[in-house]
Amino acid sequence: MSTPFPKTADKVKGVQILGPIPDEAKHIFNQETLAFVATLHRGFEARRQELLNNRKEQQKLRDQGFLPDFLPETEYIRNDSTWTGPALAPGLIDRRCEITGPTDRKMVINALNSNVATYMADFEDSLTPAWKNLVEGQVNLYDAVRRNLSATINGKQYNLNLEKGRHIPTLIVRPRGWHLTEKHVLVDGTPVSGGIFDFAVYFYNSAKEAIAQGFGPYFYLPKMEHHLEAKLWNDIFNYSQDYIGLKRGTIRASVLIETIPAVFQMDEIIYQLREHSAGLNCGRWDYIFSYIKCLRNHPDFILPDRSQVTMAAPFMSSYVKLLVHTTHKRKVHALGGMAAQIPIKDDEARNRAALENVTKDKLREVTLGCDSCWVAHPALVPVVLKVFNEHMKGPNQISLPPKEPFKPITQRDLLSPFVPGAKITEQGIRANIVIGISYIEAWLRNVGCVPINYLMEDAATAEVSRTQIWQWVTHGAKTDTGKVITKEYVKQLLDEEYAKLTKNAKPGNKFKRAFEYFAPEALGEKYSDFVTTLIYDDVTTIGRALPGERL
């Protein structure tokens, strides 16, 4: 009988691996896995490219003055109250506190030992996609799913807590976004999608084992800008489940609403994912980055210092309210935002103030109806749980009536840049410079999650840092003292902060290279869609090609 799936030997022809596969990873990166990667690439890459081209066309329209809005052609989906998402999946019913972080072994162990509901293992914003990081990350997740995880790091032993009766956080994997490629893996001479690669390797090796452990193949999907991008994922999910013999709907995907176009298409995104939908998440920093990026040609949409653009800002609050209303209407989770603070061990007063801000922020979210929130550090878990346990008595708030009547959210509500007391300060410019250069420097050293000024920063905050300065310079914004933010003024601040950063920097640092990337963006000389694509080639280690047939 014929099969829609070609033989493994045929599928791996044309596959080339341009990075080393260590012995401890060969059971994962085998012919069958790479054949699956190649099959998805050949079946779906053309559509990915079409969708990326659509992003460019949509940006051209925005540059011409056609601002983001609700789509008239999908109004019937938004207005149809009869459809909902699927029943909640095992391990994804109560998600009140989710910890996030990269996939290095220590992080995976610490996250799974935390008193949280889920752990989002990240191949995206908090991981530099160096080949070594990606391979080791897949090995770590393979072992995590099988509860076979330990490590000795700097003489200290780390073990997964397998105490009987203990809840081990549900594992959710975040693959890279549609815009990122994986240059270490070629299929028919073309680099594969980073997201498809991350998804395929994990899914093929661990989907069935995840089910055996009582959860399933669960994912977080980042940076989508159109509901058809969600449809592409849905089609990949259906094909993948058929490929390994799983029932459709076994996969579940939570979507980060972290772009301005996506906030106008939340109903449609849930609808496109259908039986695979597991809710929507508030991706604060990338959302602010997308706001600036999408509206960058328009001087009417200038934002103040990033420290002032909190979730209490009117346009950010509208975004959360609409997300909660939309998800609960469709019977899926409303997933709150990130608490990025890390403990300030040497200053009790500052640490207490930081934790009070976390409490206030999470109280706002749970009161608005959010079913969960993210933390970047285990020390914040008790703080967050105290708020959610007090104000959310059940496993979630999906079926509860809202505490306040929902007032329809308009295009103006979502786009208005008004922030009470808004101002741009020299301190804010300097902070953006320090964060941007420091993050890029760490990324170039293969570190994608970086503590800076007691906040855990990832690529999203670096994006905000560079785009804010670009916006201020490009449109001649003024500081609170009336000083026009010119290229010359920013150049002076750049030089001063760069000198401070390099004065006591450790040998082997990458500050010079980071400055070379950051400065042209901040000075308004160029604008890159993503800083991660701009600097990706610096962390690739392209080596001699290993044909798929020889794996």
Swiss-Prot record:
GO annotation terms (biological process): glyoxylate cycle; tricarboxylic acid cycle
Coiled coil (residue ranges): none
GO MF annotations in UniProt: malate synthase activity
Keywords tagged on the record: Glyoxylate bypass, Glyoxysome, Peroxisome, Transferase, Tricarboxylic acid cycle
Catalytic class of the enzyme: transferase
Active site: 174, 458
Record's protein name: Malate synthase, glyoxysomal
Gene source species: Candida tropicalis
